[in-house]
Curated annotation (Swiss-Prot):
The gene is nuo-49. GO terms for molecular function: 4 iron, 4 sulfur cluster binding; metal ion binding; NAD binding; NADH dehydrogenase (ubiquinone) activity; quinone binding. Keywords: 4Fe-4S, Electron transport, Iron, Iron-sulfur, Membrane, Metal-binding, Mitochondrion, Mitochondrion inner membrane, NAD, Oxidoreductase, Respiratory chain, Transit peptide, Translocase, Transport, Ubiquinone. SUPFAM superfamilies: HydB/Nqo4-like. Core subunit of the mitochondrial membrane respiratory chain NADH dehydrogenase (Complex I) that is believed to belong to the minimal assembly required for catalysis. Complex I functions in the transfer of electrons from NADH to the respiratory chain. The immediate electron acceptor for the enzyme is believed to be ubiquinone. It is found in: Mitochondrion inner membrane. Its EC number is 7.1.1.2. This is NADH-ubiquinone oxidoreductase 49 kDa subunit, mitochondrial. It is a peripheral membrane protein.
Length: 478
C-alpha cells in the first residue's frame, strides 16, 4: 500500500513538471530605457479594489516629474513664467519658548514667552502676577503704622527706601516736619540701601553672564551692610525702621564709627570689581550694543533711574525734587551715552562712588537731637516717660491699637529709589486707615519695555537684558 502511494506521487510530480509554463504577455508600450524620471502611474498608486486611495492634498505634494526642467521651456525654448511657489508663500511659523518662571536668571518668578526665529528674538511677552499678594488692598485694612511693614516686602533688596517713600507721603498728609537728625539718618541709610541694591544688581548680572568671582566678593560686603541694618533696627531684611514722623530709634553707640571704617575701605572693593569686569573682553562683548534704547524711547516707555540715565537723560529726583537732607549734600549724577547694557553698568558703578560720597557727608554733618516728632499722637513717647506719666502710657496704647487719624486728602510722593522712581499715591478719608494706596513700582515699567530692548537680539542676550533691568518681583507684582 505504501509502495502504491509512493508511485502515484511520483507520477503526479512528473506530470506537473512536463506541463507547459505560462508566459506573461509584456506590453511593448510600457517597456522603456532606464531613466531617472519615473512614470506618473507609478507615482500615483490607486487601490480602489481594496477601498484605499492615496490622494495628494495640494500641488506642493506632487512628485517632481520634471527633474531636468524641460516642462519650464516653451516650444521655442523661451522659459515659461513659473506658477506661485506655495511653500515660499506659506507663512513660516516661529518657534515659541517659555523662559521661566523657574529659570535661575529670571530674578524671581518672571515668565517670558519668547517668539524665536532660530535664535533671534522676534517678540517677547512678559507674564507677571505670579508673586501678586494684594499689597495695595491689604494696606486699606491696616492703620498707617501697620501698613508700613508691607513696603519692606515690595522691593526686598532695597527695603528702607520703600519705607521712606510711604513715610514721606503720610507726613505730607499730616503736614509735619521731622527733626534734622532724622533727615540725615534717613539719607545715610537710603544710600547704604542703594549700595546694597546695586551690589545685588551688578554682581548677579555678572553671574548670569558667567562671572562668578565678583558675586562672591560682593556678598561679603553686603553682609557688612546687613549688620548695620540689624544693629539699627533689629532686623537684617525687613527693618520697619523709617516711620512716619522720623525713624524708629536713634543710632546705637559706635555704629557711626563702624560705618566710617567700612566706607573708607569700600572704595577699594569697587576698584577690584571694576578690574574684573569693566575691561573684561567677554563682559564687553556680552553687554556693549545689547538692549539699546534711545533717550526718546526711554521717556516714552516711562523708564526712570539708571534705565533712563543710561540713555543720556540726567533725571534724578534727589536733584530735581530733593527730599530729606538731599538738598544739603553734594553729589554728581552719572549719565550714559549709548543707552546699552554696558553704559547702564558703568552708571551703577559710578553710583557706588557717589553714594559713598553722600555717606561721608552724612557722617560729618550728622546733628544731635531727637529722631522723631514730639507729637505723641503720631510717634510713641519714650519708654522712660511711659513708666512715669499716665498720659504718655495712654498715648502709647492708643497709637498701637487705634492708630492716628490722617486729615482727608490725597497726595503723591516719589523718591529716587535704587531701581528708579518709587512712588506712592495715598488717599485719606480722615480715618485711621488709608482709603486707597497705589504703588508706582519702577520695575513694572521697565519690564514693559523688555520687548523693545530684546527684539532682534539672540536668545542668550535676553539674560543680559533682564540683568540690566534690575528686576525684583515683589514690587513688580505687588
Amino acid at each position: 500500500m505504501a509502495t502504491t502511494l509512493f508511485r502515484l506521487a511520483g507520477r503526479n510530480a512528473k506530470r506537473h513538471c512536463m506541463r507547459q509554463s505560462t508566459t506573461i504577455a509584456h506590453n511593448l508600450n510600457s517597456t522603456r530605457a532606464f531613466s531617472a524620471s519615473a512614470l506618473r502611474r507609478y507615482a500615483e498608486p490607486s487601490y480602489e479594489g481594496q477601498g484605499t486611495r492615496l490622494v495628494p492634498t495640494g500641488d506642493d505634494f506632487a512628485p517632481n516629474n520634471d527633474l531636468y526642467g524641460l516642462e519650464a521651456l516653451k516650444a521655442d525654448g523661451a522659459p515659461r513664467v513659473p506658477p506661485q511657489d506655495h511653500i515660499l508663500a506659506r507663512k513660516v511659523r516661529h518657534y515659541t519658548v517659555n523662559f521661566g518662571p523657574q529659570h535661575p536668571a529670571a530674578h524671581g518668578v518672571l515668565r517670558l514667552i519668547l517668539e524665536l526665529k532660530g535664535e533671534e528674538i522676534v517678540r517677547a511677552d512678559p507674564h507677571v502676577g505670579l508673586l501678586h499678594r494684594g499689597t495695595e488692598k491689604l494696606c486699606e485694612y491696616r492703620t498707617y503704622l501697620q501698613a508700613l511693614p508691607y513696603f519692606d516686602r515690595l522691593d526686598y533688596v532695597s527695603m528702607m527706601t520703600n519705607e521712606q517713600c510711604f513715610a514721606l507721603a503720610v507726613e505730607k498728609l499730616l503736614n509735619v516736619e521731622i527733626p534734622e537728625r532724622a533727615k540725615w539718618i534717613r539719607t545715610m541709610f537710603a544710600e547704604i540701601t542703594r549700595i546694597l541694591n546695586h551690589l545685588m544688581s551688578v554682581l548677579s548680572h555678572a553671574m548670569d553672564v558667567g562671572a562668578l568671582t565678583p558675586f562672591l566678593w560682593g556678598f561679603e560686603e553686603r553682609e557688612k551692610l546687613m549688620e548695620f541694618y540689624e544693629r539699627v533696627s533689629g532686623a537684617r531684611l525687613h527693618a520697619a525702621y523709617v516711620r512716619p514722623g522720623g525713624v524708629h530709634q536713634d543710632i546705637p553707640l559706635g555704629l557711626l564709627d563702624d560705618i566710617y571704617m567700612w566706607a573708607t575701605q569700600f572704595g577699594d572693593r569697587i576698584d577690584e570689581t571694576e578690574e574684573m569686569l569693566t575691561d573684561n573682553r567677554i563682559w564687553i562683548d556680552r553687554l556693549r550694543g545689547i538692549g539699546v534704547v534711545s533717550a526718546a524711547d526711554a521717556l516714552n516707555l516711562s523708564f526712570t533711574g539708571v534705565m533712563l540715565r543710561g540713555s543720556g537723560v540726567p533725571w534724578d529726583i534727589r536733584k530735581s525734587q530733593p527730599y530729606d537732607a538731599y538738598d544739603q549734600v553734594e553729589f554728581d549724577v552719572p549719565v550714559g551715552i549709548n543707552g546699552d547694557c554696558y553704559d547702564r553698568y558703568l552708571c551703577r558703578m559710578e553710583e557706588f562712588r557717589q553714594s559713598l560720597r553722600i555717606i561721608h557727608q552724612c557722617l560729618n554733618k550728622m546733628p544731635a537731637g531727637p529722631v522723631r516728632v514730639e507729637d505723641y499722637k503720631i510717634s510713641p513717647p519714650p519708654r522712660s516717660a511711659m513708666k512715669e506719666n499716665m498720659e504718655a502710657l495712654i498715648h502709647h496704647f492708643l497709637l498701637y491699637t487705634k492708630g492716628y487719624a490722617v486729615p482727608p486728602g490725597d497726595t503723591y510722593s516719589a523718591i529716587e529709589a535704587p531701581k528708579g522712581e518709587m512712588g506712592v499715591y495715598v488717599v485719606s478719608d480722615g480715618s485711621e486707615r488709608p482709603y486707597r494706596v497705589h504703588i508706582r513700582a519702577p520695575g513694572f515699567a521697565h519690564l514693559g519695555g523688555f520687548d523693545h530692548l530684546s527684539r532682534g537680539h539672540m536668545l542668550a542676550d535676553a539674560v543680559a537684558v533682564i540683568g540690566t533691568m534690575d528686576l525684583v518681583f515683589g514690587e513688580v507684582d505687588r
